[in-house]
From Swiss-Prot:
Keywords of the record: Cytoplasm, Gluconeogenesis, Glycolysis, Isomerase
Annotated protein name in UniProt: Triosephosphate isomerase
Gene name of the record: tpiA
Catalytically driven reaction(s): D-glyceraldehyde 3-phosphate = dihydroxyacetone phosphate
Broad class of the protein's primary localization: cytoplasm
Species: Aeropyrum pernix (strain ATCC 700893 / DSM 11879 / JCM 9820 / NBRC 100138 / K1)
Pfam families: TIM
Pathway stated in the Swiss-Prot or TrEMBL entry: Carbohydrate biosynthesis; gluconeogenesis; Carbohydrate degradation; glycolysis; D-glyceraldehyde 3-phosphate from glycerone phosphate: step 1/1
């Protein structure tokens, strides 16, 4: 598979309005310029409109509820109906139970959607991988948003996570996240066995988001 650059837009100011549309156009450019898959993990409120600009969009969360009377919840079917590629679930800023994760993965698979399941530890990554999501993102929460890259500060977390997932679910890709800021951080993550990276502030707070995504993508691209 191609290396993956997943950008969690979170709720930064640049995740909405014209900034979000510009980011989607930038992601499309990078995906054309480099042989790397770029995924935008967007807020629910504008995910479908961004998917009209760039086709590889996930939502940041989904709930294990069916369509119907569930005010304020996001059924997985909503992502399918809006033409999105997939859903992210269990980010450290929005943790869910294992039963919740299991239900979302099962429903998404039945609808042909991808799932990026987040995990804080190698052990949690392996448990998530048992459910057969498309990808698992391993992010030590204490490094998220710090600019201290997991690939440099805690490389053993990546190697242990990759090994743990491979033992239980060899087909599930592992992304490394937390503190990934520069191209060198992304390159090192791939060298440690990850299939890509999950980033947020490095891109969302960058003065030049296109340039930052290009830097990260080029660092992971296979020669």
């Amino acid at each position: 598979m191609k290396p993956v650059l997943a950008v969690n837009m979170k709720t930064y100011s640049s995740a909405f309005g014209e900034g979000a549309r510009r980011l989607a156009r930038d992601a499309a450019r990078v995906a054309r310029e480099v042989d790397v898959r770029v995924i935008l993990v967007a807020p629910l409120i504008n995910a479908s409109s961004l998917a009209g600009v760039y086709g590889d969009v996930y939502i940041q969360h989904a709930d294990p509820v069916d369509l119907g009377a569930h005010t304020g919840y996001t059924p997985v079917e909503a992502a399918a109906a809006e033409g999105l590629r997939g859903v992210m679930v269990n980010h450290s800023e929005h943790k869910v139970t294992y039963r919740h994760l299991q239900a979302v993965v099962s429903k998404a698979r039945s609808l042909g959607l991808e799932v990026l399941a987040c995990a804080d530890t190698p052990e949690e990554a392996a448990a998530a991988a048992l459910l057969r999501p498309s990808m698992v993102a391993l992010e030590p929460p204490e490094l998220i948003g710090t600019g201290i890259p997991v690939s440099q500060a805690k490389p053993e977390v990546i190697t242990r996570g990759v090994e743990a997932v491979a033992r239980v679910a060899p087909g599930v890709a592992v992304l490394a996240g937390a503190g990934i800021t520069a191209g060198e951080d992304a390159r090192r993550a791939v060298e440690l066995g990850a299939q890509g990276v999950l980033v947020a502030s490095a891109v969302m707070k960058a003065k030049d988001p296109h340039g930052k995504m290009l830097e990260l993508a080029e660092a992971m691209a296979k020669p």
